[in-house]
Amino acid sequence: LCDQVHSGSYRPQPVRRAYVPKADGAQRPIGIPALEDKIVQGAVAEVLSAIYEVDFLGFSYGFRPGRSPHHAVDALNAALIKRKINWVLDADVRRFFDSVDHEWLLRMVAHRVADPRILRLIRQWLLAGVLESGKWFKTLEGTPQGAGISPILANIFLHYSLDLWVHVWRQRCANGEVIIVRYCDDFVMGFEKPTDAESMMGDLKRRLSKFGLGLNEKKTRLLEFGRFAAERRKRRGMRRPETFDFLGFTHYCCMNRKGHFFVMRKTQRARMIRKLKALRTEARLRMHWPLRKQQRWLAAVLRGHYGYYGYLGNSRALSNFAYQVRKLWFRALCRRSQKNAMTWERFNRLLKVFPLPVPRIVRT
């Protein structure tokens, strides 16, 4: 494989198209590359990451070394609390991975990468096509989600098309404070002045359209949010401030015990419903497994859930998720045997022998 890459005889295979459910009920297409392509893409991704890591801006968090969704959530939380933010732009780029313009992307990569072999490999991957239901389809635009090279290519594309532009815009055009936190194609902006927020909406649409991108109008919202939002809305006879979702969390305004403004996070409802639905399907498939094996599987699921969503203030959602997991296990065991009917009393005794982890707060 190494010799093929160096000699130029390497030819990538089309990616296999599959679909995974999204939080809104739609299907997200992903591309599954062949093993050889995964290996080569992984090597090239490491090279590109080493080159571009020094260029990427501080508010970009997705798929970067030493950064995680929690770093992005914490950075957003700190900015909303400590900075003068009164308005939030919850932006959603429409079908980003399917809409990446190949020529723009290759020009952006060539800005920092002079090796023609790297550029040729990237072009080959972009044009390899997809296999769906046994049929081959051309890929004239986009980079498939699921491919090992796609995250770094997405960051490069958004670095030039969005990040650098926003950085200059808030220095030259804004009249008040402006913050942004981006995780791959998901980003949130905060504004001190409503005029800045409204100007950004128009300018952002024009900027993205230049690169073949656009905002999802149904999911992109400008909302009043911040330390004074509740008081101002109350004076106008309006309800409490709206909430917004980012990286699986619903963010909302509140006051702590000392009366200071705080931003709390809870599990995004749509995400939890989708996860429980998938677990119910899995539980039916595993209902004839030995009880110890089932318990280990569900315990791992719960620990992973607590590890991601275990923020201070999210106890109710964590407890609800734990209850729903116990409930779906109970129902799966009820289907397992018609002779020895499972009751809640018997199930609770079983939980003492095969306990499940209790909700834990692991992040503040």
Language-model-derived ranges and their functions:
Residues 1-364:
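Non-catalytic terminal/accessory segments
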